A protein has these predicted regions:
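Short, surface-exposed loop/turn segments at beta-strand-coil junctions that are enriched for proline
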Residues: 505-514, 527
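Short, solvent-exposed loop/turn segments at the edges of extracellular beta-sandwich modules
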Residues: 525-531
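Short beta-strand segments within Ig-like beta-sandwich modules, predominantly Fibronectin type-III
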Residues: 495-500
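C-terminal motif of bacterial Sec signal peptides marking the signal peptidase cleavage site
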Residues: 27-30
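Bacterial N-terminal signal peptides that target proteins for export
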Residues: 5-18
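N-terminal acidic, glycine/proline-rich low-complexity segments
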Residues: 37-435, 439-471, 478-480, 484-492
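Hydrophobic beta-strand segments within extracellular beta-sandwich modules
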Residues: 518-520
Length: 539
């Protein structure tokens, strides 16, 4: 399509090669039933599902102001109660920069910085309603105070000490010992400048080793694509022990590649649903959420990237009015939401932000594949797309919160715990029983679904020779990694009995070894206007 042929433009570029590619579709794989002799479950330690008081993830956003970043900021503000927002820093990337007249650098696709202030103003208008429905939303003035301008003049520019880089430096060095997730929606250059300032201040002092240890233990960079060269040229070389979650491909499927999935995955990204449930009549913040052909025009952006215009719809007939555009950066904060999937405990576990494989002790990438029942193959992208319906329904419920002045006017997600605990030990051949207890704050009816997240297990059902993985590229951009099933390959050999009730039983395989893990997920779904879910993963 003409939309996918623009070779320089971020996240919409280099995707025309997708047309001939088979991409993943679908939602959850189900589980079958089985019977076995019953023994007692063994719980390791306390019943942590009910005793641990979890702390919110601490995070700072860095953004280059592309339209999909803007949409991600809007979604993020509806989830700002779920995390501890430490800051928003505007930065540049190879796709968006402000330019520097004195240095002869022309701006490129620069959308400015005022949009952030305008979004916070709109958030301020819906803040009273949001606060009716959940505790913990940050006060608008606080969000303003922690919003900074970083290194924006050029792609990868990290020479200048800026307000944003100094603010990141302060966060990295403060006394809060929680991990700080740096969501990298644009380039890493402002982050690199902050780290370089720390290096320049401390490298030749007796505090340097202590400072390095502090930074390495605190900072986690969640990078959505490498959008400038500052990570490779500076951070990786000078701060090799900083932990990196690098999403180089899965994000595309919640970005400009979403259209190449079928309805099993993307039905809630279509125009009719998006307009009714997100944009229309949901208050001033959601009015700013950009959809295809909605009349939105972004100053500074290229004419051919103005997706809100009639001309764009005319030239890109594969899209319908009000279709989803992109939120390629949202997986970086969806990963941080405590919805019971426990994704923050280990990037290999998987959750709303997709699933990642270990490259080394400090680096995770899109090397883990989930089985897609609709294409009958393993796909890295399915570790993200399998959650789309749940993600979108939850977003729609929070959009309703923006205009619902009373708690009773909107729907709220249930909660669920597992009586036996969330970390269990058992013997090979042992029968396990798990009991879920769900509650709904609105008094809605709750249904249960148990399923095995087999791909996250370390226990392997199939021990034969597997086929090689295949990478799909558009130009030099990785879009997906897939693997076809080998002949007679078993995907899931563990049968669940009672998978649609609050109590499930299954038998640990006889060939399970000490240290093997099996991941069982229970979903509790309400029957509100929009069906909302909460999960609990038991390992």
């Amino acid at each position: 399509s003409s939309d996918l042929s623009k070779m320089k433009n971020k996240k919409c570029s280099l995707l025309s090669m997708l047309v001939a590619s088979v991409l993943c579709v679908g939602m959850f794989a189900g589980c079958n039933n089985a019977k076995a002799p019953e023994t007692n479950n063994k719980v390791e330690g306390q019943n942590v599902s009910s005793t641990i008081q979890k702390t919110k993830a601490r995070t700072v956003i860095t953004t280059d102001g592309e339209v999909d970043d803007m949409n991600s900021v809007i979604r993020f503000m509806l989830y700002a109660n779920e995390v501890d927002l430490a800051g928003i820093v505007v930065t540049s990337s190879m796709y968006h920069y402000a330019g520097d007249e004195e240095k002869g650098i022309e701006p490129f696709r620069w959308t400015g910085t005022k949009w952030v202030d305008e979004f916070i103003d709109a958030y301020e208008e819906v803040y009273p309603n949001l606060s009716v429905h959940a505790e913990g939303y940050p006060e608008p003035e606080h969000v303003r105070n922690i919003t900074k301008i970083g290194n924006i003049s050029d792609a990868g520019e990290m020479d200048e000490v800026t307000e944003g880089s100094e603010y990141l430096k302060e966060l990295f060095l403060d006394d809060d010992d929680r991990e700080l997730y740096v969501q990298t929606w644009g380039g890493t250059n402002t982050t690199a400048r902050a780290l370089k300032s720390i290096e320049e201040e401390y490298k030749d002092t007796d505090k340097w080793e202590e400072i390095q240890k502090k930074i390495n233990e605190k900072v986690v960079l969640y990078i959505i694509l490498d959008q400038d060269d500052s990570y490779g040229e500076y951070i990786a070389k000078n701060w090799p022990s900083i932990r990196i979650i690098n999403d180089r491909s899965n994000f595309w499927h919640f970005a400009y590649a979403w259209k190449y999935h079928n309805d099993e995955v993307n039905s809630l990204l279509q125009g009719d649903w998006m307009y009714e449930n997100i944009k229309a009549n949901h208050g001033p913040l959601l009015e700013k959420y950009a959809l295809m052909g909605d009349g939105n025009y972004i100053e500074g952006e290229l004419e051919e990237e103005q997706r809100g215009t009639e001309e764009y719809l005319k030239n890109n007939s594969e899209y319908n009015r009000y279709d989803f555009i992109s939120e390629g950066d949202s997986p970086s904060f969806l990963y941080l939401i405590d919805n019971g999937l426990r994704s923050m405990e280990d990037p290999t576990y998987g959750g709303w932000g997709s699933r990642f494989g270990v490259v080394n002790d400090n680096l995770w990438k899109n090397t883990e594949l989930d089985y897609n029942p609709y294409t009958n193959q393993y796909e890295a992208s399915y570790s993200l797309t399998r959650w789309f319906d749940d993600i979108q329904n939850d977003f729609a419920a929070r959009a309703d919160w923006c205009v619902a002045k009373t708690y009773e006017e909107a729907n709220h997600a249930p909660t669920v715990k597992v009586k036996e605990g969330i970390d269990l030990t058992a013997k090979a051949g042992e029968k396990i029983t798990l009991t879920a207890d769900a509650k709904d704050p609105d008094g809605d009816e709750i249904t249960y679904k148990w399923w095995r997240y087999a791909e996250a297990d370390t226990y392997e059902d199939y021990k034969g020779q597997k086929n090689e993985t295949e990478d799909t590229y558009a130009g030099d951009l990785l879009l997906d990694t897939t693997r076809k099933l080998a002949e007679n390959e078993v995907v899931d050999s563990i049968k669940l009995e009672g998978s649609d009730t609050n109590k499930v039983t299954f038998t640990v395989p006889e060939d399970a070894k000490s240290g093997d893990t099996i991941h069982i997920v229970v979903e509790a779904k309400d029957n509100g206007k929009i069906n909302l879910k909460h999960y609990q993963r038991v390992i």
